[in-house]
């Protein structure tokens, strides 16, 4: 039976990011995934947007993590040579009802410590984006909303983690896990999946 300090279940964006971070320490790490490559499942079909957290529910774990993670991507993408662009986003209000919701959305952003969300008039939005619906009444501009290549990002996380000693066991399922109530090592049982070849 192989001993390791940490087993990460899942080689998607989160699993590979955690593996990369843990690879900086003097611990043994194994990443297990049932797929034949990293970045499968949700990581291969996401929106490729790095959010600021402007519209997350204030006080939630989601808002805390998204707001904290957003500024990290500048260094991560530079270190790993991953395509990344802070292109900003526009939240246009076309109807009167949408327009009336803008102050509440901006207030939510401020409560999430995203202070750079700006109100834009109809004219300002059409100057920024001439192809917007001409019925636009105004909107919000979120300058730090960004785009990234999620496939390259996950691959870069995994390659960096691997180069730093993390072991990846792909096509492997976790078939059991023993948990203890007192602080002590946990045991996991792994099973290699039959090859599809």
Model regions and ranges:
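Short phosphate-binding/catalytic loops that engage adenosine nucleotides
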Residues: 27, 114, 166
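Dinucleotide-binding Rossmann-like beta1-alpha1 core, especially the glycine-rich loop
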Residues: 48-128
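Short, flexible, mixed-charge acidic loops at enzyme active sites
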Residues: 41-48, 132
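A short, basic/flexible loop-to-alpha-helix module at the beginning of a structural domain
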Residues: 1-3
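Helical element adjacent to the flavin cofactor pocket in flavoenzyme catalytic cores
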Residues: 144-178, 182
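Single conserved hydrophobic/aromatic residue that forms the stacking wall/gate
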Residues: 180-197
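Glycine-rich FAD pyrophosphate-binding loop
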Residues: 24-42
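N-terminal Rossmann-like FAD-binding beta1-loop-alpha1 element of flavoenzymes
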Residues: 6-30
């Amino acid at each position: 039976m192989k001993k390791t300090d940490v087993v990460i279940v899942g080689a998607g964006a989160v699993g590979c990011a955690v593996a990369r971070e843990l690879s900086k320490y003097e611990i043994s790490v194994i990443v297990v995934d049932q797929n034949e490559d990293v970045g499968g499942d949700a990581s291969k079909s996401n929106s490729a947007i790095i959010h600021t957290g402007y519209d997350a529910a204030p006080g939630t774990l989601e808002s805390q993590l998204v707001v904290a993670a957003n500024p990290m991507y500048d260094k991560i993408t530079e270190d790993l040579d991953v395509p990344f662009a802070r292109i900003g986003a526009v939240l246009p209000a076309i109807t009167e009802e949408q327009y009336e919701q803008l102050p509440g959305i901006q207030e939510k952003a401020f409560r999430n410590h995203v202070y750079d969300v700006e109100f834009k008039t109809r004219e300002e939005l059409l100057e920024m984006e001439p192809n917007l619906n001409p019925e636009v009444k105004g909107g919000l501009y979120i300058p730090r909303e960004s785009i990234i290549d999620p496939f390259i990002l996950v691959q870069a996380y995994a390659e960096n983690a691997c180069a730093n000693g993390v072991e990846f066991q792909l096509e492997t399922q976790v078939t059991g896990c023993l948990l203890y109530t007192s602080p002590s090592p946990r045991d996991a049982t792994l099973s290699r999946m039959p090859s599809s070849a």
